[in-house]
Amino acid sequence: MAMGRLAHSIVVLAAALAAAVAVRYLDNDYHLRIAFTMCTYYLCAAGMNVLVGYAGQKSLGQAGLFAAGAYAAALTSSHTELSAWLALPLAAAVAALCGVLVALPSLRVKGPYLAMVTLAFGVVVEKLVSEWTDVFGGAQGLYGIRPLTWNDQPFTSEQWVWFGIALCAVTHWLLRNLLAGRFGRALLSLQADEIAAASVGVRVYRAKVMAFVVAAVTCGIAGALVAQQNQYIN
């Protein structure tokens, strides 16, 4: 088992390094933006795999969690003097809190009804950011979002992609190790039969909440990255 994990870690590291080297051969800013967008999509998909693929929970509200992370980073970067780097963990924390709120109904509703509840969360977020213009800027959005920096200089397009690749590799490694253990087995048991899972000691509701939080955090970080790279969000 230990050798298998080590081999997988080496493969992930090698793939990340190969992707980072390949970035040097992308010849224009458009291609670099596409590569960066692929990284953010991977972060969202990795979290969704935990929630849907392992825990079997249906969610249609990930766009709302993406927006929560994006606006948290935008407000932190544009309305405070805090470092843009601190906006990332703050965005993850806000998204995690929203993930807990979305998970609360999962104790009572399941299947398509849970999907409808999560969809309603996304609608509420969309209405909130579009109607509360004093805070979120409404249709005009938020400008002046400070990007991530290196040596006091804003990230270049290449650096954004390199950072995205690094985050994807770390996220993949962390989630794989997390899901290979007790937590992953608990989530798979939920997908198979919640009653049977509870009968063998799995804390069903806690496992559901943790799955929602993991998916929310990855989406929130992806949203924060998009807001900081564009320096504008609406």
Placement of each model-derived feature along the sequence:
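Transmembrane alpha-helices and adjacent helix-loop boundaries
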Residues: 1-234
